[in-house]
């Protein structure tokens, strides 16, 4: 299915970008892309967003394996007839596996996209995180659209 190719694309871009950061930037180094808005910052995270559950790799291994299994099951069962759901799940699957690869082989996740939103210093994130978030937002949009259709 095409949705697995979306996941593979996300994994490839995610891992390539992380490899580039690790090989070419010192930890903590930052390159401004748009001053006071967007930076490429070499950062490592041993937990989830905002450092939640730091150094609890066993927890992330278990949760990710279960989550990936659920996503694959859901893709096989429902994505065949629902294009937007398939794209969403492909993005989520790719993001989950991208960060899982880091946790297994590095014992930490490489983050590098650093954004300041209205002067708020948002936590540094990566391509996998972005794919996960976009996938979730697409599912929310689809759910809202389906709810609207049911009312009509």
UniProtKB/Swiss-Prot annotation:
Which pathway is recorded for this entry? Protein modification; lipoprotein biosynthesis (signal peptide cleavage)
**Which PANTHER family does this one have?**
LIPOPROTEIN SIGNAL PEPTIDASE
The record's Gene Ontology cellular component field reads: plasma membrane
- Molecular function via GO: aspartic-type endopeptidase activity
State which Enzyme Commission number(s) the record gives.
3.4.23.36
- Sorted alphabetically, which InterPro entries does this protein's record hold? Peptidase_A8
What parts of the sequence cross the membrane? 55-75, 85-105, 124-144
Its function?
A: This protein specifically catalyzes the removal of signal peptides from prolipoproteins.
* Catalysed reactions listed for this entry: Release of signal peptides from bacterial membrane prolipoproteins. Hydrolyzes -Xaa-Yaa-Zaa-|-(S,diacylglyceryl)Cys-, in which Xaa is hydrophobic (preferably Leu), and Yaa (Ala or Ser) and Zaa (Gly or Ala) have small, neutral side chains
Q: Where is the active site?
A: 111, 129
Q: Name one GO biological process term.
A: proteolysis
Q: Where in or outside the cell? A: Cell membrane
Q: What is its main location?
A: membrane
Protein name, entry field: Lipoprotein signal peptidase
- Keyword annotations for this protein? Aspartyl protease, Cell membrane, Hydrolase, Membrane, Protease, Transmembrane, Transmembrane helix
What family, per the record?
A: Belongs to the peptidase A8 family.
Q: Which PROSITE patterns match?
A: SPASE_II
Membrane topology per the entry is:
Multi-pass membrane protein
Annotated organism of origin: Bacillus cytotoxicus (strain DSM 22905 / CIP 110041 / 391-98 / NVH 391-98)
